[in-house]
């Protein structure tokens, strides 16, 4: 389901504070490590790199203008697909 328009987009407060600190020059421009896959990407995030957790490790995500409005978690898959395995030793 989509989020109600009257509520507006969501991003974790700690993530917004880190982005603002980087844009103001208070923090060095290095990747921001986050577990917040649910946060919406805002236009102020463009050009920054986030390390988004996929349940196992942090994956680097460089934000471009096409990503605005999407969630951070959309760009980091949580599951690996190894294909439908053929049975070993099966002959036709």
UniProtKB/Swiss-Prot annotation:
Q: Does the keyword Ribonucleoprotein apply?
A: yes
Query: Where do transmembrane segments lie in this chain?
Result: none
An annotated Gene Ontology molecular function: structural constituent of ribosome
A cellular component term from Gene Ontology for this protein is: small ribosomal subunit
The family database entries (PANTHER family) matched by this protein are listed as: RIBOSOMAL PROTEIN S19P FAMILY MEMBER, SMALL RIBOSOMAL SUBUNIT PROTEIN US19M
Keyword Ribosomal protein on entry: yes
Keyword annotations for this protein, in alphabetical order, are: Ribonucleoprotein, Ribosomal protein, RNA-binding, rRNA-binding
Q: Which family does it belong to?
A: Belongs to the universal ribosomal protein uS19 family.
Q: Which Pfam families match?
A: Ribosomal_S19
Alphabetized InterPro entries for the sequence: Ribosomal_uS19, Ribosomal_uS19_bac-type, Ribosomal_uS19_CS, Ribosomal_uS19_SF
Recorded source organism is: Mycoplasmopsis agalactiae (strain NCTC 10123 / CIP 59.7 / PG2)
Q: Briefly, what is this protein's role?
A: Protein S19 forms a complex with S13 that binds strongly to the 16S ribosomal RNA.
A Gene Ontology biological process annotation?
A: ribosomal small subunit assembly
Which protein, by its recorded name, is this? Small ribosomal subunit protein uS19
